Swiss-Prot record:
Topology term for the membrane: Multi-pass membrane protein
Name this protein carries in UniProt: Heme exporter protein B
Protein purpose: Required for the export of heme to the periplasm for the biogenesis of c-type cytochromes.
GO biological process: cytochrome c biosynthetic process; cytochrome complex assembly; heme import across plasma membrane
Stored Pfam families: CcmB (PF03379)
Organism of this sequence: Escherichia coli (strain K12)
Record topology, Periplasmic segments: 42-44, 122-127, 180-192
């Protein structure tokens, strides 16, 4: 099926640029590490501010990685070829965003036990953090994809991309950190996780169409 061929191709291309994959991950880890060094190793304080630290770091690292979502395709001319495929352009966008999450969002999940240890979180807090990252990091990709498509042809589109995308991430940031706060106090988190799941379902449904329209505008 052409969808999965595009997905596998995107993964292969991403792994050829391993440095661009590693940079956001290093940024995420460095930001997480700086907080215990700057405010001290007090476990209660670190656990209290951990939700905000983790999600701001995840948001900023995802913005670093988002810029290359369509940039390489535009530079080598393959973006126009993707638009001519018999597969609908929203499906192509969906495959690209999924592959992008596999190489940028999934590693954050793998690093989550280390992050929990650095910030003094308990096992339940780590489990909820991992769930928020599982639901929230692909949502970040879907929220950012239309902005990337609109700015892909600009030489210095990074600042404009941040201005476009950051306001859209505020609800995600609120509910993800609220879920982790509730977990730290051993309160129910099902409602917060349900909202995060709804945000993921909504963005995964609507974002490919908005991104496809933005790509057509940028190419023209």
């Amino acid at each position: 099926m052409m969808f999965w061929r595009i997905f596998r191709l995107e993964l292969r291309v991403a792994f050829r640029h391993s440095a661009e994959i590693a940079n956001p991950l290093w940024f995420f880890l460095i930001v997480i590490t700086l907080f215990p060094l700057s405010i001290g190793p007090e476990p209660q304080l670190l656990a209290r501010i951990a939700p905000g630290i983790i999600w701001v770091a995840a948001l900023l690292s995802s913005l670093l990685a988002l810029e290359r979502l369509f940039r390489d395709d535009l530079q080598d001319g393959s973006l126009e070829q993707l638009m001519l495929l018999p597969l609908p352009l929203p499906a192509v966008v969906l495959a690209k965003v999924m592959a992008h999450w596999m190489v940028t969002g999934l590693p954050l999940l793998i690093l989550s036990p280390l992050v929990a240890m650095l910030l003094g979180m308990d096992v339940y807090g780590w489990q909820v953090m991992a769930l928020t990252l599982l639901l929230g990091t692909p949502t970040l990709g879907f929220l950012g994809a239309p902005g990337v498509a609109l700015t892909v042809g600009l030489k210095r589109g990074g600042v404009l991309l941040s201005i476009l995308v950051l306001p859209l991430t505020i609800p995600l940031l609120i509910f993800a950190t609220a879920a982790m706060d509730a977990a730290s106090m051993h309160l129910p988190v099902d409602g917060y996780l349900a909202i995060l799941g709804a945000l993921l379902a909504g963005t995964a449904t609507l974002s490919p169409f908005a991104t496809a329209a933005a790509l057509r505008i940028s190419i023209q």
